């Protein structure tokens, strides 16, 4: 009772501050709720008379008895409604083992809505004996399993999670489960400790497969891999024959595409020969035509006799109508023979002379 007298001020000091809308009963309830939360070293004695707030104006004995009777706790009612845990009982977990679960299993809600799991009841902790576990500092408790996490993720000891089997999904028969879920057989991937709920062993996937399997499911014309040596599949092999030439360009397996884009050397020569000779000689009695204007200009010099290219060698006064003729003539003075035969040691100053010589080796 000493704590009650030191904790609460007198009513006279409270009334001196101003009018309060709360009555004395409200203050009494507030004081008792605070005492229930901040309990001392032991539980209150039920045999002790109820606590009172001292005031200068003490009410009559009849009023005090009525208030004490109203404020007294109904212990029988509270003890029957709130039952503590069984002695020596451990917190129950409703999660199934991975081998027994056939679908998505969730643990049911706890049976009682009172205190935390594994702890004493509300009233049992308040009204129990002094050596009750509620008055001792609680030891470290294991965390209650999450309602939406599989038992393999709970900290309780559980068997080693198995690896979930993955394989490419083919639309043909025997392709496993449909609808984009992971199949059960094929390429095995070990399940990590922090893997999602759907990747644990014994639990089916609760969501569609990721989008990285799209190249296996978008194209309906695919067939299963043919029996033979296992090779790493590429993305182009999964697209099919119809999509290679249209969107990704031709490959070595499409000879028609290469034939259209890259013409052969023979085709280029024929195309060069078919070019129209637009430049025609206008000299009377000469109907020659040329594809280049420079060739026609050199030809006209034969009709006019013009020879603008003169040899600069000392003592040589030869002149030529074309520059290539002057170049061949100048090699006679220098003795230069740049065209050499690869089959014999002979060399020539003109390319046409080398061509005639190569015919002898044939």
Curated annotation (Swiss-Prot):
| Coiled coil regions, renumbered to chain | none
Q: Where is this cross-link: Glycyl lysine isopeptide (Lys-Gly) (interchain with G-Cter in SUMO)?
A: 54
Give, from the UniProt record, the effect of changing residue 331 to G. Answer: In blood group-In(Lu)
Q: Where are the zinc fingers (C2H2-type)?
A: 279-303, 309-333, 339-361
For this chain, the Swiss-Prot or TrEMBL PTM comment says: Acetylated; can be acetylated on both Lys-274 and Lys-288. Acetylation on Lys-274 (by CBP) appears to be the major site affecting EKLF transactivation activity.
Omega-N-methylarginine: residues bearing it: 184
A Pfam family (short name) is: zf-C2H2
Tell me what effect the entry lists for residue 326 to R: In blood group-In(Lu); decreased transcriptional activity shown in a BCAM promoter-driven luciferase assay
Q: What is the effect of changing residue 301 to H?
A: In CDAN4B; likely pathogenic
Biased segments, Acidic residues type = 58-67
GO MF, any single term: zinc ion binding
One GO cellular-component annotation of the UniProt record comes to:
nucleus
Q: Which residues carry this modification: N6-acetyllysine?
A: 274, 288
Q: In which tissues is it expressed?
A: Expression restricted to adult bone marrow and fetal liver. Not expressed in myeloid nor lymphoid cell lines.
Chain positions of motif 9aaTAD: 71-79
Disease annotation reads:
Anemia, congenital dyserythropoietic, 4A: An autosomal dominant blood disorder characterized by ineffective erythropoiesis and hemolysis resulting in anemia. Circulating erythroblasts and erythroblasts in the bone marrow show various morphologic abnormalities. Affected individuals also have increased levels of fetal hemoglobin.
Listed under subunit, the entry gives: Interacts with PCAF; the interaction does not acetylate EKLF and inhibits its transactivation activity. Interacts with CREBBP/CBP and EP300; the interactions enhance the transactivation activity. Interacts with TFB1.
| Protein name per Swiss-Prot or TrEMBL | Krueppel-like factor 1
Organism of origin: Homo sapiens
Q: What is the lineage of its organism?
A: Eukaryota, Metazoa, Chordata, Craniata, Vertebrata
């Amino acid at each position: 009772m000493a704590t009650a007298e030191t904790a609460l001020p007198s009513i006279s000091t409270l009334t001196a501050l101003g009018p309060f809308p709360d009555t004395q009963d409200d203050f009494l309830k507030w004081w008792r709720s605070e005492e229930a939360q901040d309990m001392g070293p032991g539980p209150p004695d039920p045999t002790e008379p109820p606590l009172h707030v001292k005031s200068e104006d003490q009410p009559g004995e009849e009023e005090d008895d009525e208030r004490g009777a109203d404020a007294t706790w109904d212990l029988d009612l509270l003890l029957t409604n709130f039952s503590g845990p069984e002695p020596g009982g451990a917190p129950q977990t409703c999660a199934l083992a991975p081998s027994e679960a056939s679908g998505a299993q969730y643990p049911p809600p706890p049976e009682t809505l009172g205190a935390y799991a594994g702890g004493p009841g509300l009233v049992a902790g308040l009204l129990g004996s002094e050596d009750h576990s509620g008055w001792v500092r609680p030891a470290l408790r294991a965390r209650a399993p999450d309602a939406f996490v599989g038992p393999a993720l709970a900290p309780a000891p559980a068997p080693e999670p198995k690896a979930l089997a993955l394989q490419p999904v083919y639309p043909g028969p025997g392709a496993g489960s449909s609808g984009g879920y992971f199949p059960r057989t094929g390429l095995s991937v070990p399940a990590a400790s922090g893997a999602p709920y759907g990747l644990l062993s014994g639990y089916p996937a609760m969501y569609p497969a990721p989008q990285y399997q799209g190249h296996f499911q978008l194209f309906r014309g695919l067939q299963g891999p043919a029996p033979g040596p296992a090779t790493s599949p590429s993305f182009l092999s999964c697209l099919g024959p119809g999509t290679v030439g249209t969107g990704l360009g031709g490959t070595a397996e499409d000879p028609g595409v290469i034939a259209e884009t890259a013409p052969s050397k023979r085709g280029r020569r024929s195309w060069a020969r078919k070019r129209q000779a637009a430049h025609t000689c206008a000299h009377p009695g000469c109907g020659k035509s040329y594809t280049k204007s420079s060739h026609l200009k050199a030809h006209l010099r034969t009709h006019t006799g013009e020879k603008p290219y003169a040899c600069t060698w000392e003592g040589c006064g030869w002149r030529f109508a074309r520059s290539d003729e002057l170049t061949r003539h100048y090699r006679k003075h220098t003795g230069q023979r740049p065209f050499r035969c690869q089959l014999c040691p002979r060399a020539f100053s003109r390319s046409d002379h080398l061509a005639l010589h190569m015919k002898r080796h044939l």
